[in-house]
């Protein structure tokens, strides 16, 4: 009961609960599963626009819930090619976000979120997915269209009749001093306050290594290789076991994980080329509680989870 309360009511991650009780993360997952089976915890998954949350009643989604403790989402059939699959993922994610009917939305970055943004831009009328929209991370370099957070927010806000909030910083500061100066700016304070009030966060689940590499060598040195990073959520890198890799020289500017944990709906979105290890690793962190992903990625991630616990 205490484990279930910490996870579902206090929004603690499975890794945090494991640390509190001195048990393994798989044991926490097992206890949460038993709580559902015994009726201690009841989770209702409704279609977009119904009840409080979205879901598809898909057996693969059920497997993700059993394996990783997520609350809902959608598993998307693979198309004849990656482009078709990514379009289907973007369309499904839009329906899910609209079905949540929440006010304050935070947007990550990446190619699949860029596809979603382009889908919104092409729509005939407004796509209502939130009343206020802000970026979750600073802006990428020139020429990286899908990693320019303010542009993604601008387009989405314009075509959803939402109020935008922008961040006037790069995705990564060059030094600790520059990071501190950035965090002292009025604009950063406004964005931080927007992060504190979020109802929904849409985050890209990416691979490691990746292109672009997000200045990973400057931020982490050899840590990502030594600690065997497999994936990424926003600009945080994770291991297959679900641990976020930390570095004293990581000066990334993005929503702090302690604020992300408090967001009611954290929707992780995967493209056709997301590696199953990346999805599994990110879900094991406990920060993502809704997922939109292609079926082949989901099925392989579930199998990896079974292999890890054999």
Name each model-derived stretch.
Residues 39-53:
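Short Lys/Arg-enriched helix C-cap and helix-to-coil transition segments
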């Amino acid at each position: 009961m205490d484990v279930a309360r910490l996870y579902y009511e206090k929004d603690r991650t499975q890794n945090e609960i494991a640390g509190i009780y001195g048990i393994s993360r798989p044991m926490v997952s097992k206890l949460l599963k038993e709580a559902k089976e015994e009726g201690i915890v009841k989770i209702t998954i409704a279609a977009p626009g119904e009840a409080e949350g979205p879901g598809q009643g898909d057996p693969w989604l059920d497997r993700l819930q059993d394996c990783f403790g997520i609350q809902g989402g959608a598993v998307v059939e693979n198309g004849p090619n990656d482009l078709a699959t990514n379009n289907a993922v973007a369309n499904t994610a839009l329906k899910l976000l609209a079905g949540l009917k929440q006010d304050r939305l935070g947007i990550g970055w990446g190619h699949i979120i860029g596809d979603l943004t382009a889908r919104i831009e092409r729509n005939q009328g407004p796509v209502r997915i939130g009343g206020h929209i802000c970026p979750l991370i600073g802006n990428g370099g020139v020429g990286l269209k899908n990693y320019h957070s303010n542009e993604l927010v601008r387009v989405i806000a314009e075509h959803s009749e939402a109020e935008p909030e922008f961040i006037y910083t790069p995705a990564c500061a060059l030094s600790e001093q520059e990071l501190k100066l950035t965090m002292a700016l009025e604009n950063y304070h406004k964005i931080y306050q927007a992060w504190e009030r979020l109802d929904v966060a849409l985050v890209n689940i990416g691979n490691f290594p990746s292109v672009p590499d997000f200045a990973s060598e400057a931020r982490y040195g050899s840590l990502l290789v030594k600690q065997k990073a497999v994936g990424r959520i926003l600009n945080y890198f994770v291991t297959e076991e679900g641990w976020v890799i930390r570095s004293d020289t990581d000066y990334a500017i993005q929503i702090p994980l302690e604020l992300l944990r408090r967001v009611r709906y954290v929707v992780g979105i995967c493209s056709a080329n997301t590696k199953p290890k990346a999805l599994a690793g990110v879900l094991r962190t406990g920060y993502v509680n809704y997922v939109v992903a292609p079926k082949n990625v989901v099925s392989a991630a579930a199998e990896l989870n079974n292999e890890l616990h054999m």
